[in-house]
């Protein structure tokens, strides 16, 4: 199911293979976010060409639109979307709990209002599992409570306890899954930014022995040093034979920090979100194409990059597309930023293979930061 093929000698970074129903996934792996089963401004064939083997879709959003009944009619999420690689489906917990004025948490589940039409709905660990089972997701995420940064200890403890209870119920549903369904269940550790809660949560989750473990509730607005502290601590509590997933990280700093600490999978909407506003990721920092300085620029966005944008079009032309609000500009920028993420991961993999990850991480981030400072 998960095989480690190389450990870096100077860090906890590692290379692995995660075996999933729709093909093996080489780790570390950046997972693009296709919330509704599609990447914004990117066709499936472009993603496949870039080498994407695992995409994230969101249960909350798919439940509200198009609806579970529609996806069930097609047989599963793969048939509905025609995506023939792997899907990880988030439980939707983060989205539900971000609706702070529109939801009520109970031991049984969570009552919430739709952000679309205000209609009321109720999620339980069992119902969320059932939806993902209908999707035939390759990786299923348990319903959890992602508590915000800055809450007090008692509230964090309560949410941690509920998350553990929901994990047990999800595992029970998973053990009774339909015959022939081979998706993997990842349970989620919580605990906010309190180490004793993190330890308690992780020990309880590990007792359930799910195929994979996610570290939830970090990268939620805390300072980077707090992120690093909890990331390192929580990752150290998880056995090395388990695939580890940190949810919602997508900047070069956070990703390389995660890889350094033995994390195998991560996702984020950031690369495509900033692309839609004309921000291009490069090895020298972020290039903001709407700036006047690029009007006459005949260079590619990044010489080393082999995406469609960088092999065919100039910075000046891309700026023209954005200023003209042409859809092609967003499509090209989105492809470029996803390609950048995959290139970054491949560079990290090469460094791990050569036991050079620590040096690579420092040199890469120094160069990236210098480019951003010189804007």
UniProtKB/Swiss-Prot annotation:
Active site: 90 (proton acceptor), 267 (nucleophile)
Keywords of this entry: Glycosyltransferase, Metal-binding, Queuosine biosynthesis, Transferase, tRNA processing, Zinc
Binding residues for substrate: 90-94, 144, 190, 217
Top EC category: transferase
Catalysed reactions, as listed in the record: 7-aminomethyl-7-carbaguanine + guanosine(34) in tRNA = 7-aminomethyl-7-carbaguanosine(34) in tRNA + guanine
Sites where the protein binds Zn(2+): 305, 307, 310, 336
GO cellular component, one term: cytosol
One GO biological process term: tRNA wobble guanine modification
Region (RNA binding): 248-254, 272-276
Pfam families cross-referenced by the UniProt entry: TGT
EC number: 2.4.2.29
Record note on cofactor: Binds 1 zinc ion per subunit.
Cofactor(s) of this protein: Zn(2+)
GO molecular function: metal ion binding; tRNA-guanosine(34) queuine transglycosylase activity
Pathway connected to this protein: tRNA modification; tRNA-queuosine biosynthesis
InterPro entries recorded: ArchSynthase1/Queuine_TRR (IPR050076), TGT (IPR004803), TGT-like_sf (IPR036511), tRNA_ribo_trans-like (IPR002616)
NCBIfam families linked: Q_tRNA_tgt (TIGR00430), tgt_general (TIGR00449)
Assembly behavior: Homodimer. Within each dimer, one monomer is responsible for RNA recognition and catalysis, while the other monomer binds to the replacement base PreQ1.
Family according to the record: Belongs to the queuine tRNA-ribosyltransferase family.
The protein's role, per its UniProt record: Catalyzes the base-exchange of a guanine (G) residue with the queuine precursor 7-aminomethyl-7-deazaguanine (PreQ1) at position 34 (anticodon wobble position) in tRNAs with GU(N) anticodons (tRNA-Asp, -Asn, -His and -Tyr). Catalysis occurs through a double-displacement mechanism. The nucleophile active site attacks the C1' of nucleotide 34 to detach the guanine base from the RNA, forming a covalent enzyme-RNA intermediate. The proton acceptor active site deprotonates the incoming PreQ1, allowing a nucleophilic attack on the C1' of the ribose to form the product.
Protein's name according to its UniProt entry: Queuine tRNA-ribosyltransferase
Organism from which the protein derives: Borrelia duttonii (strain Ly)
Gene designation per UniProt: tgt
């Amino acid at each position: 199911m998960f095989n480690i093929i190389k450990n870096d000698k100077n860090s906890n970074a590692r290379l692995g293979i995660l075996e999933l129903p729709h093909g093996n996934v080489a780790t570390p792996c950046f997972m693009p976010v296709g919330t509704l089963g599609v990447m914004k401004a990117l066709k499936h064939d472009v993603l496949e060409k870039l080498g994407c083997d695992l995409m994230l879709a969101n249960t909350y959003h798919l439940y509200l639109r198009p609806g579970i009944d529609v996806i069930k009619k097609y047989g599963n999420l793969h048939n509905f979307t025609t995506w023939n690689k792997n899907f990880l489906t988030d439980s939707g917990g983060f989205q539900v709990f971000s609706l702070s004025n529109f939801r009520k948490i109970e031991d049984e589940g969570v009552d919430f209002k739709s952000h679309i039409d205000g209609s009321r709905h109720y999620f339980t660990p069992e119902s969320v599992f059932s939806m993902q089972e209908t999707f035939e997701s390759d990786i299923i995420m348990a319903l959890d409570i992602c508590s915000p940064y800055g809450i007090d200890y008692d509230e964090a403890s309560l949410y941690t306890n509920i998350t553990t209870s929901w994990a047990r119920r999800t595992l029970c549903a998973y053990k009774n899954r339909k015959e022939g369904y081979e998706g993997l269940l990842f349970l989620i550790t919580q605990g906010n930014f309190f180490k004793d809660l993190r330890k308690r949560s992780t020990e309880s989750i590990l007792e359930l022995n799910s195929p994979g473990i996610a570290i939830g509730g970090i990268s939620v607005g805390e300072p980077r040093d707090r992120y690093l502290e909890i990331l390192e601590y929580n990752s150290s509590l998880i056995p090395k034979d388990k695939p580890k997933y940190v949810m919602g990280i997508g900047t070069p700093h956070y990703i390389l920090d995660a890889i350094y600490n033995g994390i195998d999978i991560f996702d984020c909407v950031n690369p495509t979100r900033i692309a839609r506003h004309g921000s291009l990721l490069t090895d020298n920092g972020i290039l903001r194409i709407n700036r006047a300085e690029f009007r006459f620029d005949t260079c590619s966005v990044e010489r080393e990059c082999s995406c469609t944008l960088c092999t065919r079009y100039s910075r000046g032309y891309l700026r023209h597309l954005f200023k003209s609000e042409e859809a092609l500009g967003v499509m090209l920028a989105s492809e470029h930023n996803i390609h950048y993420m995959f290139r970054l991961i491949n560079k990290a993999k090469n460094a791990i293979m050569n036991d050079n990850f620590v040096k690579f991480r420092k040199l890469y981030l120094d160069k990236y930061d210098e480019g951003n400072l010189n804007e």
